[in-house]
Amino acid sequence: MTEYLGTFNGSKLKIAIIVARFNDLVTKRLLDGAFQTLAQNGVSKEDIDIYWVPGAFEIPRVAQKISQKGNVDGIITLGAVVRGETSHYESVCSGVTSGIAQIALEGKVPVMFGVLMTENMEQALNRAGGKAGNKGSECATGLLEMIDIEQTIDRE
């Protein structure tokens, strides 16, 4: 039996982070968590590109374009959809989830899903550095692990 476990070595990796401006009280905290975690794991700040988009619904389009270009090793998507502030909550959540999932499967590089979908702002803030940790940070470690696993598979 062979077991593969990804590492968190980010040196020499180029990372794209796509961040929704809508609900930026939350998304800026997610970005801070992702950025700090990438830096702590060896990713140079010069190798991190941040793309701001209007809202979560626009994230898949930009992720697709970045993935097709192939000039990054991985993509982190960050957004916050809060039910109480969005009258079309289900439609936005469904579209964003489907779009990012499709790019993750069909794109050239790993994509991490860091779009929060919560009932209220308190839940969102708890997941952006509050009681429930920082999902941006979790996406960063997950992305580094996925990049390493995929590179291992490609070498075999």
Curated annotation (Swiss-Prot):
Q: Which UniProt keywords apply?
A: Riboflavin biosynthesis, Transferase
User: Per the record, what are the reactions this protein catalyses?
Assistant: (2S)-2-hydroxy-3-oxobutyl phosphate + 5-amino-6-(D-ribitylamino)uracil = 6,7-dimethyl-8-(1-D-ribityl)lumazine + phosphate + 2 H2O + H(+)
The answer, when asked if Transferase is one of the entry's keywords, is yes
Sequence intervals crossing the membrane: none
Q: Which GO terms describe its cellular component?
A: cytosol; riboflavin synthase complex
Relate the protein's function as given in its record: Catalyzes the formation of 6,7-dimethyl-8-ribityllumazine by condensation of 5-amino-6-(D-ribitylamino)uracil with 3,4-dihydroxy-2-butanone 4-phosphate. This is the penultimate step in the biosynthesis of riboflavin.
Q: Which NCBIfam families match?
A: lumazine-synth (TIGR00114)
Instruction: Tell me its family.
Output: Belongs to the DMRL synthase family.
What is the protein's given name?
6,7-dimethyl-8-ribityllumazine synthase
Q: Which organism is it from?
A: Pediococcus pentosaceus (strain ATCC 25745 / CCUG 21536 / LMG 10740 / 183-1w)
> Corresponding gene?
ribH
